[in-house]
């Protein structure tokens, strides 16, 4: 499960928008927003975001465990 708040923070820190990241990973904005709401991305998409957003600790963002 993706920690979407941390991902949004990294996107903003890099001066990007969610629309920019959608284009970066090759999906429509609608698809990106849907994946953000579900907290699920494919491994290829995750790798592109790690590389392009210079994410230092991807485990904290992309493999976050939600406690309920």
Q: What are the roles of these predicted feature ranges?
A:
Residues 1-16, 20:
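A short, Lys/Arg-rich alpha-helix, primarily the initiator
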Residues 8, 33-34, 62:
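Key DNA-contacting residues within the recognition helix of helix-turn-helix
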Residues 12, 23, 51:
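Alpha-helical residues within the helix-turn-helix
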Residues 18, 29-30, 57:
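The DNA-contacting recognition helix of HTH DNA-binding domains
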Residues 26-40:
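Recognition helix of helix-turn-helix/homeodomain-like DNA-binding domains
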Residues 38-51:
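Short, basic-rich loop-to-helix N-cap that marks the start of a DNA-contacting helix
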Residues 54-68:
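Short C-terminal boundary/hinge segments that cap the last helix of small helical domains
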